């Protein structure tokens, strides 16, 4: 009898085990965990970089920027007509619906990058160590600027800050803010000693100093701030490389999800260029970008592990050529253009070299700009910038004779419109 | 005595297990009670249990209706209770005096509705159906016999009011899903709670294979649902409560209803040995009609048709064009044809197969205790070559009467289940899909000199590569055990304590061999693929219920119950995938490219609740029950734990009133019970243990990182609350020959949880939150009757009809359409049922005819266009659609009603049971139909080849000339199936055995439907909330089974 009572009692005691009302998640940290420590924020920097560069948590910004820009400007061709979203971009115009998955994920991932980068900027204020504080802030500035710059390349208006019913600013304001963020970061970097351990944790493959300068040059160029673009581009050390790195677990997204499947999209012959823009048959960049390996890989998308440059030395030279040309400093412009044309693969940090004779065409602004544009198309093939370039160089717009792009700007994603009453009207084309 | 000889060793063993609970038994005078139970015809009735009320003494009648047992009773008045399935319970008083033997003979009458059937579900206090204010379905062991179903879940089909049972796959290890009264949750599971012998068991379907298979984001759950581990031969009875009424007792986990399963136990008497063995033959029930026209559009590239130009000629002109994209499609489709040989790949994929099911049980016992042990083996081969399912089982149960007032019962069930699988649907490397996605013009049996299969269409895979070289396996080791203590220390007080656990370890291994031919899409792993995954599940259940029954007044009986329940669930999931394989090795070590992070995911969750319930019974005809319950789960924040859920129910047995028996209709209208109940429940498993947090994904990148996710949680999320009202009646006519039961119900689910899409400018794209309201309104009816009954012949018939209307009545935050699958084909839209197809449709003229457009001289259909904001179609100056493609609702995968009609005929020892199932008014999204026509092997493609529709018609519908016209892909799934025919012959009193039964059973014999596919019942997403998804799912085989049951 007593023993039965014992069973009863021990059963009741067992109840206590089941009463625990809160279990911590051992698999993943919460937002609070992450932003309450320097170590947590350091790892979010890696997380943001991953979102921007790798398809692990959703289509990466760089992947969809390259895909969308490539399809809208005839750099890429759809391999299977069944890929309706890609076909919409390739066909462009009214075919591009707001619920298009490519522009949807380009928008959402890039907004997440912007939002998380802002959280880093805000979170850095609570860090005691001034070097670490600045380091976190600098990376916050870098990724926020990249997010804003990426969105400004595809949309007319952009939310600068995230939140419920976020408000929109013009792309000029977004690019201006991006430039400010980058320049502030450069200044801050001058007074900061980033601990080596910090750099190795967030990735030494990005040369912070030169990346901040190069991106500032890029966005200044987009803003047509010619002098600032020249100043920044010329300050970049062209021997330094900054890349997004890849491996088997974090595969090069354009290779893995794009070209290697033989069923998504592929590169076009002659970079998709024709007529006056047709590149010279001897242009060695043809070999670099257009010769496919057995896995359909080429250029910066050879295999799972090929690194994608954040900027190329050639871009800095072409920015200086373009800005000078726009300032009518034609001779100076030609010097920079010739540097690109004459550059050998060995001279380029990434092995991109045209190895062509210097520019011999007419020394007019229009001719020079066209040659600069052509070289951007070739040198910076599949860098995600061609839609922006095509607009900036006033190439034939959709609907015009010989149209070289299928859209000017993208419509705002359906999901954004459904959830944000401030979403601006879609562009006509 | 024989009895002792057999029972002693077992008793000894059980004593060892339960040694601590053996207590001294007070010696009271032993009396022998015996007698005979007879039916209306004067013949003895077997299997009637006889119990001395409020004691643990009792026995069961034998084949002649005789019973006899010993009881230790003090002198005084007692009541004997006689109960049995299909009979009205009967009581007889008995006064124990100085004698040592007593006789009690009774006559009992049949009861078609089983209103006096003892019910355990609902309270731990044994009660009768009569007292319950909610509907309950019971399935007894007799009904469980003579069915060819090897998965327990399938047995519920057609036997439970309000249940929709769907076999999602014909894979021998495929799953079945059940919904009681419609979809109860969208984010969480809609499946009922399963309880075996008081222990909550898991019925989920973890994906340990097919990790790379969900190409569509259709949340596939395609393996077996884990109730497959339970052998139906071990089941004694099943009780099912459909609604929130179940939740008041079982806690909010039962908000989708509860299925309580009782395994067999021994009965007092000599040992009984039962052997069941069967053999089954499976075959493909329905063959697809394939294109048979010996021509193909295009210009052949080479003899084997492997050039780019030989791809997709139905929808594209790829000849001589540089890319293969829409720019090329924009050109004129080729009208030239070339001769081809057309094949029917079904001959290569399907094969007839066999299976066997064997079960041996031994049971018996004395008045001190009973035992039941069983062992079983099942093996079944699939009709898709290279697939099978195998299960070993062992089951032990013992019941011990420790003292007059204490009983202990303990049981353990062990199963080892293994399966050989092939990728399920939702991708293009499953056996069905590889066949669907290529035109049927390649000889897939061709091989090179080394015996390797040859390439078929570029990019695609040879279906035989999948069948011959893939190796997918799962293995599950499971054990469910329980220990229950029942105490009746004083008269009227009953205490039940149940402790038990359900634990299993499920391992899956996938090996997809390297493909020996070139040009297969990298997405199909031509470099080979290997994965392993392991899912460990542990759930511990504790239940403690005390109830006290006494007479408050002479005619007013009170039963009070209070209880506490707690569960603790722990899961671990580990997985690794790899590709680029070295030869020979078939495990993860072969992979040279571990392209995903190793997965190691652990969860812990506790669920707890306590309740109080009070029932008043007036003169055993009017019962009023009220209950309240507090429930909480660690999946929710502190503020959302301990929510109060009330319940009330009323049962009025009108026919027990005096006026009824004195009326003249009482001669044919024998029984009328009215019932009504109201209950509230919160879905405690509606979100995962950690879903409420905003969490970052640990990633291996640079020095390690925390990746921000697209989806975020809401820490203040609340459980979905289901409020249900149900009312109904149970009626009996013509002395039990005709029974009618029906229920009307109305479920309102508020705070429905959904991953809700938010504007990305919030910094995330989806938020898991309480987002809407949903209702299920319905009607359930069961008619049972015995139209003919005489000495030798009997005809029983039953009709079950369930109607349910599901509607998402409100979405908060002005949410529009919320897609459930990645393609956004089906989802949630205010005012419509869950899972509606919200899709593009044909542009039509005012008279309803298709508004065609001219494409290269051919008149082709097109999508409707207009203003997306208003959904109003627009026309341009030429009268053609303009604007963005519009969407409309075209059907949903939830049936309007399901019905089952069963006829059972028995003549002497021969019986025939025929079950017809009808599922009506639901639609299937036929992905396979689209694909088959797009690639050319479908019947519409054949019509285009024959010129019966203009060139380009398939391309226009398939989305290659303008957006896809999805309306055409939604097809009516309504079907009537001859589910089962069972012919059984029983032989009694043989020399070597007590009885022997031979059955011939056919399952899934005929389906009457208009569906253009294998079977409208299957679902490629398996047990997921995504329904009606026909994308390469395995067809359900036709099965013939011969079985032999011998009782020794």
Give residue spans per PLM region:
Chain A
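Bacterial Sec-dependent N-terminal signal peptides
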Residues: 1-28
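Aromatic-residue-lined binding/catalytic grooves and analogous aromatic/hydrophobic interfacial grooves
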Residues: 20, 179-190, 209-244
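Short coil/turn linking the two alpha-helices of tandem helical-hairpin repeats
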Residues: 150-159, 193, 222-225, 328
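Membrane-proximal, proline-rich intrinsically disordered regions
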Residues: 19-68, 395-429
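Hydrophobic-face positions in mid-chain alpha helices that act as interaction patches
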Residues: 81-90, 224-317, 344-359, 365, ...
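Conserved, well-structured interaction surfaces
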Residues: 42, 48, 82-155, 165-172, ...
């Amino acid at each position: 009898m007593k023993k039965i009572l014992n069973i009863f009692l021990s059963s009741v005691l067992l109840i206590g085990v089941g009463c625990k009302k809160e279990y911590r998640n051992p698999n993943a940290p919460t937002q609070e965990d992450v932003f309450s420590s320097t170590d947590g924020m350091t790892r979010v920097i890696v997380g943001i970089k991953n979102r921007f560069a790798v398809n692990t948590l959703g289509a990466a910004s760089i992947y969809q920027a390259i895909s969308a820009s490539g399809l809208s400007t005839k750099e890429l061709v759809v391999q299977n007509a069944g890929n309706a979203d890609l076909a919409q971009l390739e066909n462009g115009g009214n075919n591009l619906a707001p619920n298009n998955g490519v522009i949807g994920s380009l928008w959402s991932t890039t907004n997440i990058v912007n939002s998380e980068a802002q959280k880093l900027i805000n979170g850095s204020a609570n860090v005691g160590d001034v070097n670490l504080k600045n380091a976190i802030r600098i990376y916050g500035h870098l990724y926020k600027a990249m997010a804003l710059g990426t969105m400004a390349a595809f949309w007319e208006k952009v939310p600068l800050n995230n939140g419920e019913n976020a408000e929109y600013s013009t792309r000029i304001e977004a690019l201006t803010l991006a430039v400010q963020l980058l320049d502030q970061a450069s200044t801050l970097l001058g007074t900061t000693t980033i601990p080596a351990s910090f750099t190795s944790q967030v990735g030494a493959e990005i040369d912070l100093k030169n990346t901040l300068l190069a991106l500032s040059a890029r966005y200044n160029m987009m803003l047509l701030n010619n002098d600032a673009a020249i100043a920044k581009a010329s300050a970049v050390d062209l021997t330094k490389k900054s890349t997004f790195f890849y491996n088997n677990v974090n595969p090069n997204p354009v290779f893995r999800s794009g070209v290697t499947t033989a069923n998504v999209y592929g590169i076009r012959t002659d970079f998709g260029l024709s007529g006056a823009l047709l590149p010279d048959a001897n242009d060695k960049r043809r070999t670099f970008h257009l010769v496919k390996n057995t896995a359909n890989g080429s250029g910066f998308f050879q295999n799972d592990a090929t690194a994608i440059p954040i900027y190329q030395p050639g871009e800095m030279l072409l920015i200086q050529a373009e800005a000078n040309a726009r300032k009518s400093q034609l001779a100076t412009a030609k010097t920079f253009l010739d540097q690109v044309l004459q550059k050998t693969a060995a001279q380029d940090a990434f092995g991109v070299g045209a190895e062509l004779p210097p520019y011999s065409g007419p020394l007019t602004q229009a001719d020079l700009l066209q040659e600069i544009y052509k070289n951007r198309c070739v040198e910076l093939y599949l860098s995600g910038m061609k839609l922006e370039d095509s607009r900036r160089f006033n190439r034939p717009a959709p609907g015009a004779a010989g149209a070289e792009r299928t859209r000017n700007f993208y419509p705002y994603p359906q999901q954004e419109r459904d959830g944000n009453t401030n979403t601006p009207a879609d562009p006509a084309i | 005595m024989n009895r002792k000889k057999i029972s002693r060793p077992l008793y000894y063993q059980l004593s060892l297990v339960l040694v601590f609970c053996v207590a001294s038994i007070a010696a009271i005078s032993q009396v022998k009670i015996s007698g005979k139970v007879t039916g209306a015809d004067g013949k003895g009735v077997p299997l009637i249990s006889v119990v001395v009320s409020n004691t643990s003494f009792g026995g069961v009648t034998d084949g002649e209706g005789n019973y006899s047992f010993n009881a230790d009773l003090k002198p005084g008045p007692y009541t004997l209770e006689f109960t049995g399935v299909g009979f009205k319970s009967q009581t007889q008083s008995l006064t124990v005096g100085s004698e040592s033997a007593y006789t009690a003979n009774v006559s009992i009458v049949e009861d078609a509705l089983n209103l006096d059937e003892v019910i355990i579900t609902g309270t731990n206090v044994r009660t009768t159906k009569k007292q319950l204010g909610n509907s309950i379905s019971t399935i007894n062991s007799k009904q469980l016999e003579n069915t060819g179903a090897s998965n327990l879940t399938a047995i519920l089909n057609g036997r439970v009011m309000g249940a929709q049972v769907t076999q999602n796959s014909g894979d021998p290890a495929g799953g079945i899903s059940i919904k009681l009264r419609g979809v109860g949750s969208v984010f969480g599971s809609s499946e009922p709670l399963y309880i075996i012998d008081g222990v909550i068991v898991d019925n989920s379907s973890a994906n340990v294979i097919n990790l790379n298979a969900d190409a569509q984001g259709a949340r596939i759950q395609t393996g077996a649902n884990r109730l497959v581990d339970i052998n139906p031969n071990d089941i004694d009875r099943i009780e099912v409560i459909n609604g929130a009424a179940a939740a008041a007792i079982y806690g909010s986990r039962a908000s989708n209803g509860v299925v309580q399963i009782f395994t067999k136990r021994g009965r007092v008497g000599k040992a009984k040995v039962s052997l069941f063995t069967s053999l089954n033959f499976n075959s493909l029930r329905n063959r697809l009609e394939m294109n048979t026209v010996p021509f193909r559009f295009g210009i052949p590239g080479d003899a084997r048709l492997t050039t780019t130009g030989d791809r997709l000629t139905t929808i594209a002109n790829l000849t001589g064009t540089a890319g293969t994209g829409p720019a090329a499609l924009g050109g004129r489709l080729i009208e030239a044809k070339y001769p081809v040989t057309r094949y029917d790949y079904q001959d290569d994929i399907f094969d007839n197969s066999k299976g066997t099911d064997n079960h041996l049980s031994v049971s018996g016992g004395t008045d001190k205790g009973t035992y039941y042990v069983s062992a079983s083996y099942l093996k079944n081969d699939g009709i898709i070559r290279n697939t099978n399912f195998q299960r070993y089982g062992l089951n032990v149960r013992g019941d011990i009467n420790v003292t007059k007032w204490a009983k202990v019962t303990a049981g353990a069930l062990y199963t080892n289940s293994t399966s050989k699988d092939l990728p399920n649907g939702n991708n293009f490397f499953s056996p069905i899909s590889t066949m669907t996605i290529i035109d049927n013009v390649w000889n897939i049996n061709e091989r090179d000199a080394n015996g390797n299969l040859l390439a078929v269409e570029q990019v695609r895979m040879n279906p035989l590569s999948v069948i011959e070289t893939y190796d997918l396996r799962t293995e599950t080791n499971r054990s469910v055990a329980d220990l229950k203590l029942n105490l009746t220390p004083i008269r009227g007080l009953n205490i039940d304590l149940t402790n038990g656990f359900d634990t299993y370890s499920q391992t899956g291994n996938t090996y997809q061999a390297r493909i020996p031919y070139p040009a297969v899409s990298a997405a199909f792993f031509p470099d080979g693929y290997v994965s392993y995954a392991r899912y460990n599940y542990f759930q511990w259940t504790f239940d403690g219920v005390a109830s006290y029954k006494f007479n408050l007044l002479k005619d007013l009986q009170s039963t009070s119950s209070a209880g506490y329940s707690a569960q603790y669930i722990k899961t671990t999931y580990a997985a690794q995938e790899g590709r680029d394989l070295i030869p020979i090795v078939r495990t993860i070590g072969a992979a040279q490219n571990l392209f995903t992070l190793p997965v190691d995911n652990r969860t812990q969750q506790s669920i707890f609740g306590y309740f109080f319930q009070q029932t008043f019974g007036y003169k055993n005809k009017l019962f009023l029950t009220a209950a309240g319950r507090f429930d909480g789960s660690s999946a929710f924040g502190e503020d959302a734990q301990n929510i109060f859920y009330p319940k009330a129910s009323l049962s009025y047995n009108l026919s027990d009133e005096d006026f009824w028996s004195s009326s003249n209709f009482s001669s044919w209208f024998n029984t009328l019970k009215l019932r009504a109940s109201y209950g509230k429940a919160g879905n405690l498993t509606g979100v995962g243990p950690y879903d409420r947090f905003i969490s970052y994904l640990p990633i291996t990148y640079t020095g390690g990182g925390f990746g921000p996710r697209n989806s975020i949680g809401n820490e203040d999320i609340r459980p979905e609350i289901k409020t249900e009202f149900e009312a109904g009646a149970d009626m009996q006519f013509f002395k039990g020959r005709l029974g009618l039961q029906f229920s009307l119900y109305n479920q309102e689910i508020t705070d429905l949880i959904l991953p809700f899409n938010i504007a990305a400018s919030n910094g995330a794209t989806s938020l898991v939150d309480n987002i809407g309201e949903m209702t299920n309104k319905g009607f359930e009816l069961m008619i049972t009757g015995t139209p003919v009954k005489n000495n030798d012949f009997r005809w029983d018939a039953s009709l079950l009809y369930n109607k349910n209307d599901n509607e998402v009545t409100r979405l908060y935050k002005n949410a529009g359409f919320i897609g459930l699958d990645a393609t956004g084909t089906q989802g949630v839209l205010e005012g419509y049922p869950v899972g509606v197809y919200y899709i593009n449709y044909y542009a039509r003229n005012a008279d309803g005819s298709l508004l065609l457009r001219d494409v290269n001289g051919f008149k082709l259909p097109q999508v409707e266009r207009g203003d997306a904001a208003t959904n109003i179609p627009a026309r341009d100056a030429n009268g053609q659609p303009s604007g963005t493609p519009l969407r409309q609702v075209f059907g949903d995968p939830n049936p309007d009603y399901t019905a089952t009609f069963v006829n059972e005929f028995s003549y002497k020892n021969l019986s025939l049971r025929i079950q017809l199932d009808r599922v009506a008014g639901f639609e299937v999204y036929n992905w396979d139909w689209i694909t088959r026509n797009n690639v050319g092997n479908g019947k519409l493609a054949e019509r285009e080849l024959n010129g019966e529709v203009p060139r380009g018609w398939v391309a226009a519908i398939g989305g290659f000339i303008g957006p896809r016209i999805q309306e055409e892909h939604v097809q009516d799934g309504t079907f009537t199936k001859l589910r089962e025919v069972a012919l059984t012959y029983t032989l009694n009193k043989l020399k070597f055995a007590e009885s022997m039964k031979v059955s011939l059973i056919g399952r899934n014999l005929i389906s009457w439907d208009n569906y253009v596919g294998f079977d409208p019942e299957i679902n490629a997403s398996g047990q997921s909330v995504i329904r009606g998804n026909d994308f390469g799912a395995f067809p359900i085989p036709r099965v013939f089974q011969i079985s032999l049951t011998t009782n020794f």
